From Swiss-Prot:
Its EC number is 2.7.8.13. It comes from Lactobacillus johnsonii (strain CNCM I-12250 / La1 / NCC 533). Keywords: Cell cycle, Cell division, Cell membrane, Cell shape, Cell wall biogenesis/degradation, Magnesium, Membrane, Metal-binding, Peptidoglycan synthesis, Transferase, Transmembrane, Transmembrane helix. One of its GO terms (cellular component) is plasma membrane. It catalyses: UDP-N-acetyl-alpha-D-muramoyl-L-alanyl-gamma-D-glutamyl-L-lysyl-D-alanyl-D-alanine + di-trans,octa-cis-undecaprenyl phosphate = Mur2Ac(oyl-L-Ala-gamma-D-Glu-L-Lys-D-Ala-D-Ala)-di-trans,octa-cis-undecaprenyl diphosphate + UMP. It is an enzyme of class 2 (transferase). This is Phospho-N-acetylmuramoyl-pentapeptide-transferase. One of its GO terms (molecular function) is metal ion binding. Its main location: membrane. The keyword Transmembrane helix applies. Belongs to the glycosyltransferase 4 family. MraY subfamily. The chain crosses the membrane at residues 5-25, 51-71, 79-99, 116-136, 149-169, 172-192, 197-217, 224-244, 252-272, 299-319.
């Protein structure tokens, strides 16, 4: 199979064509984002902005991946696992978004319901990997390579659930999670290309194409949000790609902003529950910088630069 930009172009085209129609449909139905009460007050003006846009780039990415791999006669079990992870987590997010819109509230699925769904999808991915004779090897720093299917399965479960939620936490500003995801998926596309892993190249390029098309409508001021349907799909996809490239730890650098966003929430909760004091003005940490007076664009650009630096450092040292 030869390298081609067809996955990117086709996914981009599908998103750019159908997203405006989706935005128009959501506006006609008066279906828009419900802004959380505890969020920054200036975000209240975003209330009513169409959401669930992730459905469009998610489907565009999947359609592009499928037709290119079928055309190239390279559709294998790895491709199906990537698609199932991407779609599976996206469906959980879709249900979450749908409940929020239907009941006109900021609470969708309950935490345990969302977690259960994420665990089920992760368990399905692990089962399919077993049937595909995937090498259940995990390199643990200072301990070396560990070949233990049970330990590896627990790690995959944690990785998929953790990073799907990490991207979700980062989706709080116009264009932020979209830009960070483009950087991360582009980095993995390059790694997959270097390793001649064409299935992952096609998948990542398809996702990038959809994201670039989506960014046209999602940058500030956003005409649409991706919703949990998009952010959970992106996080689940990234985690699965890192595992199937046998480079799971790479996501700590390539997805460094997602990691920092998650850590800020964890530290804030621990600090408040143990001392009654908050470390940050508001979490996830992008809101902290907003509270310091940074504009959304400034936060976006600085965070994108941090994400890009993390990816470059990884490629220089281990790429």
């Amino acid at each position: 199979m030869q390298f081609s930009l067809i996955p990117f172009i086709s996914s981009f085209a599908l998103t750019v064509i159908f997203l405006p129609l989706f935005i128009g449909f959501m506006r006609m139905k008066h279906e828009g984002q419900v802004i959380r009460d505890e969020g920054p007050k200036w975000h209240e003006k975003k209330s009513g902005t169409p959401t669930m846009g992730g459905v469009v780039f998610m489907l565009a990415g999947v359609i592009s991946t499928l037709w290119v791999l079928i055309w190239q006669k390279d559709l294998n079990k790895t491709a199906w696992i990537l698609i199932i992870a991407f779609l599976g987590y996206g469906i959980i997010g879709f249900l979450d978004d749908g409940i929020k819109l239907y009941f006109k509230r900021n609470l969708g699925l309950r935490a345990w319901q969302k977690l259960l769904g994420q665990i089920i999808i992760a368990a399905l991915i692990i089962t399919l990997a077993f049937s595909d004779h995937f090498a259940f090897e995990l390199y643990i720093p200072f301990a070396g390579m560990v070949r233990n299917s049970f330990l590896f399965s627990l790690f995959v479960l944690f990785w998929l659930v953790g990073f799907s939620n990490a991207v979700n936490l980062s989706d709080g500003l116009d264009g932020l999670a979209t830009g960070l995801s483009i950087i991360a998926y582009a980095t993995y596309a390059w790694i997959a290309y270097q390793e001649r892993n064409w299935v992952i190249v096609v998948f990542t390029l398809s996702v990038i194409g959809g994201l670039v098309g989506f960014f046209i409508f999602n940058h500030k001021p956003a005409k649409i949000f991706m919703g949990d349907a998009g952010s959970l799909a992106l996080g689940g996809g990234l985690a699965t790609v890192s595992i199937f490239l046998h480079r799971p730890w790479s996501l700590l650098l390539i997805g460094i902003v997602f990691v920092l966003e998650t850590l800020s929430v964890i530290l804030q909760v621990i600090s408040f529950q143990t001392t009654g004091k908050r470390i940050f003005k508001m979490t996830p940490i992008h809101h902290h910088f907003e509270m310091l007076g940074w504009s959304e664009w400034k936060v976006d650009i600085v965070f994108w630069i941090v994400g890009l630096i993390g990816s470059i450092i990884y490629l220089i040292i281990w790429g």
